[in-house]
């Protein structure tokens, strides 16, 4: 059974008074999900507004979903579980949770107990005090390995800041607070969740994006889903971010500029060879430079053609961009348990 998540409409719906939705993607966290719910519930006792917890089960193959469902319908806990059809990845799971969220503010965090939900109320207060649209957690005293996690993270944060212009200490921290009206304008894709501040900067001024030091714990159960191979994927994603940040609405400019540059170089070479052939009378048929000029000219035509096709695809994407990058199998909440 596939379920389509519909946006909440109408001002008379009681869920409109929800202040905060906490979205937590989970994958094979059977030992962590119970303590996670308990800690979130305890941390939010002092929060004075209505809130909900949304767990997104990203195709777990262990007892994660079974253990999470035990808390549905618990008194004083507004819990919704979004079960995805299969494993779509953390970015898609986060997007599913954001699409499902009904609060005015949306918080996200990991489900491995390394983020501390006690930081959420103070982060909400800080977001409002500084009038921000996005507040990013900064794991100042990070409890991870130095060589496999910390050093690659430092390098990635530096590169992302340089490329995007949004300088933060910790892009990779999942603990973030957004205004729902802003984050719902951003469509996440691929494995771009770590670059969310950069995408948000395309919607609001970077001055409305801030950070705050948060608590970070060592992992208690299971093993990290991240390894050294993830670092190489981050580099590839970073190249994609650089392209989309600069050319997402006009990709033809990128390919066109490259094509024109190659074409100009090809014309210089061919004009020189033409002068050498027809004015000076030299034989150019066996000269390698002739082949270089022809290859550059053909590459120029190919780049310009690619730019035109990219423009057509981009226009089609922005016109028809409605399909989600995930499939929901079922949603469990108070109503489904009744």
Curated annotation (Swiss-Prot):
Q: Provide the topology term for how it sits in the membrane.
A: Multi-pass membrane protein
Q: Where does it localize? A: Cell membrane
Query: Per the record's keyword annotation, is Transcription regulation included, yes or no?
Result: no
> Which InterPro entries does the entry mention?
Glyco_trans_2-like (IPR001173), Glycosyltransferase_2 (IPR050256), Nucleotide-diphossugar_trans (IPR029044)
Q: Which Pfam families match?
A: Glycos_transf_2
Q: What happens when the gene is disrupted?
A: Lack of Dod-P-GalA in total lipid extracts. The membranes of the rgtE mutant are unable to provide the substrate for heterologously expressed RgtA activity. Cells lacking this gene produce an LPS that is devoid of GalA. They are also more susceptible to deoxycholic acid and to the polycationic antimicrobial peptide PmxB when compared with the parent strain. Pea plants inoculated with rgtE-deficient mutant show discoloration and wilting of the early leaves.
Annotated GO CC locations: plasma membrane
Q: Which domain of life is it from?
A: Bacteria
The entry sums up its family as follows: Belongs to the glycosyltransferase 2 family.
Q: What is the name attached to this protein's record? A: Dodecaprenyl-phosphate galacturonate synthase
The species is: Rhizobium johnstonii (strain DSM 114642 / LMG 32736 / 3841) (Rhizobium leguminosarum bv. viciae)
From the broadest rank down, the organism's phylogenetic lineage runs:
Bacteria, Pseudomonadati, Pseudomonadota, Alphaproteobacteria, Hyphomicrobiales
């Amino acid at each position: 059974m596939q379920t389509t998540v519909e946006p909440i409409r109408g001002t008379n719906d009681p869920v409109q008074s929800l202040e905060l939705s906490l979205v937590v993607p989970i994958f094979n966290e059977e030992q962590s999900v119970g303590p996670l719910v308990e800690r979130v519930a305890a941390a939010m006792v002092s929060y004075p507004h209505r809130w909900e917890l949304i767990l997104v089960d990203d195709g777990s193959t262990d007892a994660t979903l079974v253990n999470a469902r035990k808390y549905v319908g618990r008194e004083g806990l507004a819990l919704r579980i979004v079960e995805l059809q299969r494993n779509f990845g953390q970015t898609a799971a986060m997007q599913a949770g954001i699409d499902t969220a009904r609060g005015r503010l949306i918080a996200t965090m990991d489900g491995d107990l390394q983020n501390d939900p006690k930081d959420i109320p103070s982060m909400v207060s800080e977001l409002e005090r500084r009038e921000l649209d996005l507040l990013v957690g900064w794991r100042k005293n990070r409890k991870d390995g130095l060589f496999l996690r910390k050093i690659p993270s430092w390098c990635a944060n530096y590169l992302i800041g340089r490329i995007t212009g949004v300088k933060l200490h910790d892009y990779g921290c999942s603990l973030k607070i957004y205004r729902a009206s802003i984050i719902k304008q951003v469509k996440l894709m691929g494995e771009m969740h770590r670059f969310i501040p950069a995408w948000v900067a395309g919607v609001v001024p970077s001055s409305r994006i801030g950070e705050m030091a948060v608590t970070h714990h060592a992992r208690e159960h299971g093993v990290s889903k991240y390894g050294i191979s993830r670092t190489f994927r981050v580099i590839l994603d970073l190249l994609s971010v650089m392209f989309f940040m600069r050319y997402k609405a006009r990709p033809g400019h990128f390919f066109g500029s490259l094509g024109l540059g190659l074409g100009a170089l090809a014309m210089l070479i061919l004009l020189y060879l033409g002068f050498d052939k027809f004015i000076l009378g030299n034989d150019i048929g066996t000269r390698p430079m002739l082949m270089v000029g022809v290859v550059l000219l053909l590459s120029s035509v190919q780049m310009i053609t690619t730019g035109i096709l990219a423009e057509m695809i981009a226009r089609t994407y922005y016109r028809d961009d409605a399909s989600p990058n995930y499939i929901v199998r079922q949603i469990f909440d108070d109503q489904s348990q009744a």
